[in-house]
């Protein structure tokens, strides 16, 4: 079905990273007017300028990623912890705080956050990352319920084992060690293509998902199956 987002105004954050490229491309193919922002969402001081060009949007894709930073809990550095939250949690709050009320005033809107399945199970050695992604998921659940009556649907894709340059670059995926890891840990025994995740984002951004609110949808090939 072509043109599922015809003339819909879409903001995709951090579009050069994580799932940004695949989502921006698919949404444009479906007729959306995509504003794909390559930069990381700025801190509070620069946020007003960042959103000033998007007074009205129909769809927000909160695509927020931070470079992997794995360490035992005893070795977590304050700077690494704060970096995770400054890049992924605080921007999500500011984006939804700004755009959800505007959507509510107009009586419609979609917000899709690309988060992670990691906090659904927990990853030893990645406590900081799990904490930040878990905060994102909790925020989506709460705000999704808060804005449901205003016909604004806020949901998240909690993914893992999806091809993307930040967490699963091609050279890692191609290695024998990683392929063996997939077979042991992922029931579907493969990694997802970026376009597969983008298709789920498209569904959540379209009118077909109007009855879904506050959902954190696992997309991990069976590695995580519930929230």
Protein language model regions, located:
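Conserved mid-core segment of classical short-chain dehydrogenase/reductases
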Residues: 42-45, 52, 65-82, 105, ...
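Short C-terminal tail/terminal secondary-structure segment
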Residues: 121, 202, 213-227
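Canonical Rossmann dinucleotide-binding motif of NAD(H)/NADP(H)-dependent dehydrogenases/reductases
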Residues: 3-35
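A glycine/serine/threonine-rich, flexible loop-to-helix segment
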Residues: 149, 159-185, 226-227
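Short, small/polar-rich loop/turn modules that mediate ligand/substrate recognition or access, typified
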Residues: 148, 153, 212-214
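Catalytic loop of short-chain dehydrogenase/reductase
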Residues: 110-135, 140-149, 161-162
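Substrate-binding pocket helix/loop in short-chain dehydrogenase/reductase
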Residues: 71-73, 77-85, 111, 178, ...
